[in-house]
Amino acid sequence: MSNVGTTGRIPLWLIATVAGILVLTVVGIFFYGSYSGLGSSL
């Protein structure tokens, strides 16, 4: 049960934070596109 090969020493909370920001960014772009009319057909 060693941590060898698990992305170095990056803490789990940091990975979760970055992943959350990326998800919010993608969702924000999607809704912005829908609001702008690019995806209004949805």
UniProtKB/Swiss-Prot annotation:
Main location: plastid
Keyword field contains Chloroplast: yes
Membrane topology designation: Single-pass membrane protein
GO BP terms, alphabetized: photosynthesis
Pfam families named in the record: PsbJ (PF01788)
Highest taxon, organism lineage: Eukaryota
Any one annotated GO CC term: chloroplast thylakoid membrane
Matching InterPro entries: PSII_PsbJ, PSII_PsbJ_sf
Residues making up the signal peptide according to the UniProt record: none
Cross-referenced NCBIfam families: PRK02565.1
Subunit comment: PSII is composed of 1 copy each of membrane proteins PsbA, PsbB, PsbC, PsbD, PsbE, PsbF, PsbH, PsbI, PsbJ, PsbK, PsbL, PsbM, PsbT, PsbX, PsbY, PsbZ, Psb30/Ycf12, at least 3 peripheral proteins of the oxygen-evolving complex and a large number of cofactors. It forms dimeric complexes.
Family: Belongs to the PsbJ family.
Protein name: Photosystem II reaction center protein J
Lineage: Eukaryota, Viridiplantae, Streptophyta, Charophyceae, Charales
